Each structure stands twice: as structure tokens, then as C-alpha cells.
Design a protein with these regions (language model features):
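C-terminal ends and interior cores of transmembrane alpha-helices
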Residues: 79, 83-97, 301-315, 408
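Helix-loop boundary and gating motifs at the non-cytosolic
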Residues: 1-55, 229-270, 335
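Central cavity-lining transmembrane alpha-helices of secondary-active solute carriers
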Residues: 46-66, 270-282
């Protein structure tokens, strides 16, 4: 097995274990006990999926950068973390108490979030031509997410599969206890995690770095706030990361409320990952042709457009499913474009720290604020036990639209002002 093939398999498993559980968990947590779910409130779900993610994002740089990079071979610490994470996910699947879910989700986030950086670190350490090789290897992560999101319902939630023209294309009658079985997505993720952990021992050896990380790197990275473009980007990114988090908190329950079967939620949401593959493939072209400001602006505007479609709840289900394609534009044009811009304006000796600072702000702050806001808006727009999804999504669309205008008018590229390291 070639080195690039092993790295591609690593990415496949890295994101497959995530795609196995994230799209359907909110639906399982929000469904009533009589339906087979846990009946948690919007605020509780926001804490489970929001606060946990934020804590993990803040802890990740310490675990990945200060411990893994210095004292252990990267592939071995990666193996340990994903195996521990798999066990935690398996245990979580059997819990019905909110407190247990919250604690276990925080533990899982602390061990899983660092693996995102570690898998990237291994990949970059063994590529001859990163600009050419990384997109080809990273795309297997998206494919892994799609594969897991499709495999679980086809194997465990449906019978007598048949082909249909609308995503998720391959469907069949649902099993009787389909909502209750959504919890098994966590077990499925746990199995993938343990498999991934064992596979890590087949990865190329990536020894710890002998040189200490420059202590002033973080201080220098924070000096990027002296550049107006970086400050504007961070403000817009924090806002976008908030409404981005709410997508994963509410889309599953929303699709169920308009008539999509529980077994079809995960596959339907992968329309966004298919679009992501295409958007990432052409991201370089768009950046060269239109520049960072216009591309990132379109990424933010895609959030407003997607939530506007969701808010028009009278539209057919197939339009709601197809509109998931906006997710690919949202992620590639905004998040990938933003990370590339940060890399461009940071001095070479602080690039890693700059990305870490940027990531901590949007991945640390966004999920916890998004989790709280999702619960608050759900309670605000619920009258007589009925949740008005239309007002909910239109509110988020307005936030996205205002953010797009703010970014479009205020942001000016400053790549040329970067000084040499």
C-alpha cells in the first residue's frame, strides 16, 4: 500500500467516524421518548453539541501541539485518541440521562478534536508536493463522511432497498423502531474509530519534533489583529461559525418535521458534501479569478440563501434536500478560503500559531454561542408546543445576510502587506 494510499485511507476513516453520528444525533436527542428518542430540549442539545465542541477546540492545540508534537510519534498518539474516542462513543449510545450525555460528549470532544490537526500534520509531513497532493488526499475525508452517512441507514435503518431519483437515491421501508436505532450510529462510529486506531499503526512514522515551539509564536500571531482585514475576517468568521453550528443542531429535526424519514436524514445531508467536493476542486480557480473578498463574501451569502430556502417551509421536500448543496459553497468558499487567507498574511514562522489562534476563536467560540442561540431561538419561536421553523430559519438567514454585507463593505485584502519572516 503506497504512502499516499495510506494517508487517503486515514482521511477516509478520520471523517467517516464523524459523519456516522453527527447528522442524525440531534434528531435522536430531540425526538420524544414515545418516538424512541430522548426528548431533550433545544437548550440541552445545544449544550451537548455546542459546549462540548468548544471545549474540545480549545483543548486541541495543547494536546496536539504541546504534547503530541513534542513527546510522542504522531501516529501513535492519534491511534490512542481515536480508540479512546471510540470507546466513549460506544458508552454514550447506551445513556439516556442528559448529564451523562453532556459529560461524555465533552470527554469525546477533548480526545477527538486534536485528531483533526494530527491527521493533517501526518499528511503534510509525508507529502512531496503539498499544493498538489493535499487536495487529492483530503477529498477522501469527504468521501468517508458520505460513505458512513449512507452505509448506516442502508444497513441498519431500512429494508428492501430500491433506487429513487431524489437524494438519498437508495431507500427502502424503515424498520419499526427506526428512531430508537439512531442511537446505534454512535456504536457504528465507535467501531470505525477502533478500526481507525488499529490502522494508525500502518501509517508512516512521524516522530516528535525535537525543536521547541517558539514561545513568542502565539504572541506574534495575535499581532495579526493589527491588520484590519484579519480583524474583519475574525468578526465575520465568529458570526458565521455560530450559524454554521446551528445547521448541525437543527437540520436533522427540521427535515424530519417536514416529512423526511429518519433513515434518510443522514444521506440527504450529504448532498452538501458532494457539493463540497466540487467547490473545493474549483476554489483555487475562483480565488485567482475573483480574489479573497468576493469568494469569502459568496461563502457567507450562501449561508443566507440556504437558510432562506429552509425558512420557506411550503417548498417541496426535494428542494429542501437539494438546497443542502449550498453547504459545499459555504464550507469551501468561506472556511477554506478564510484559512488560506490567514496563511497568506501570516509570517512564515507563525503560520501554524496563526491558524491555531484563528481556529480557537471560531471553533471555540462559535459552537458554544451557537448552541445557546439555537436553544434560545427555539424557545422563543415555540408557541403552544409548536416550533415555528420558518421564523427560526429566516432569522438565521438575516444574520447571514447582514454578515455578508458587513464583510463585503469592510474587508480589503492585505496580502501584499505581509512582511518576510
Amino acid at each position: 500500500m503506497s504512502k499516499n494510499s495510506r494517508l487517503g485511507t486515514m482521511m477516509f476513516l478520520q471523517y467517516a467516524l464523524w459523519g456516522a453520528w453527527l447528522p442524525v444525533t440531534a434528531r435522536y436527542l430531540s425526538a420524544g421518548v414515545a418516538e424512541g428518542g430522548l426528548g431533550f430540549s433545544g437548550s440541552e442539545i445545544g449544550m451537548i453539541l455546542g459546549l462540548a465542541g468548544s471545549i474540545g477546540a480549545v483543548a486541541a492545540p495543547f494536546i496536539a501541539g504541546q504534547i503530541a508534537d513534542r513527546y510522542f510519534s504522531t501516529e501513535r498518539i492519534l491511534a490512542a485518541l481515536v480508540i479512546i474516542g471510540g470507546v466513549v462513543k460506544w458508552i454514550t449510545a447506551y445513556q439516556t440521562d442528559y448529564s451523562a450525555w453532556l459529560v461524555l460528549s465533552i470527554i469525546y470532544s477533548i480526545v477527538y478534536m486534536p485528531t483533526l490537526a494530527l491527521s493533517n500534520s501526518i499528511t503534510f509531513a509525508h507529502m512531496k508536493d503539498p499544493d498538489s497532493d493535499f487536495p487529492k488526499i483530503r477529498v477522501w475525508g469527504t468521501i468517508g463522511w458520505i460513505a458512513a452517512s449512507w452505509a448506516f441507514p442502508m444497513i441498519w435503518l431500512q429494508t428492501d432497498l430500491n433506487f429513487q431519483w431524489m437524494p438519498p437515491f437508495i431507500v427502502g421501508p424503515e424498520v419499526a423502531n427506526v428512531t430508537n436505532r439512531l442511537a446505534d450510529a454512535l456504536i457504528f462510529s465507535g467501531v470505525i474509530s477502533v478500526t481507525y486506531g488499529l490502522f494508525c499503526f500502518m501509517l508512516p512514522n512521524t516522530p516528535p519534533k525535537k525543536d521547541a515551539v517558539e514561545k513568542l509564536a502565539f504572541k506574534k500571531a495575535f499581532e495579526l489583529f493589527n491588520q484590519t482585514s484579519f480583524t474583519i475576517l475574525v468578526v465575520a468568521s465568529l458570526t458565521v461559525s455560530i450559524i454554521h453550528q446551528i445547521y448541525f443542531l437543527q437540520t436533522g429535526p427540521f427535515l424530519s418535521s417536514i416529512g423526511l424519514k429518519d433513515s434518510q436524514i443522514g444521506p440527504a445531508m450529504t448532498v452538501g458534501q458532494f457539493a463540497e467536493i466540487a467547490a473545493m476542486a474549483y476554489l483555487g480557480f475562483f480565488l485567482k479569478r475573483f480574489g479573497f473578498r468576493k469568494v469569502i463574501f459568496l461563502g457567507v451569502l450562501a449561508y443566507a440563501a440556504r437558510y432562506a430556502v429552509f425558512g420557506t417551509v411550503t417548498l417541496p421536500i426535494w428542494i429542501m434536500v437539494v438546497s443542502q448543496a449550498f453547504h459545499g459553497i459555504c464550507y469551501a468558499f468561506f472556511f477554506a478560503g478564510a484559512y488560506i487567507y490567514v496563511d497568506k498574511i501570516a509570517d512564515e514562522d507563525v503560520r501554524h500559531s496563526a491558524q491555531t489562534v484563528f481556529g480557537m476563536i471560531i471553533l471555540g467560540g462559535g459552537p458554544v454561542i451557537g448552541g445557546w442561540l439555537s436553544g434560545y431561538l427555539q424557545e422563543t419561536f415555540t408557541q403552544a408546543g409548536l416550533f415555528d421553523y420558518s421564523l427560526f430559519w429566516y432569522t438565521l438567514s438575516a444574520v447571514g445576510f447582514v454578515t455578508a454585507l458587513f464583510f463585503g463593505f469592510m474587508f480589503r485584502e492585505q496580502v501584499e502587506k505581509r512582511t518576510a519572516a
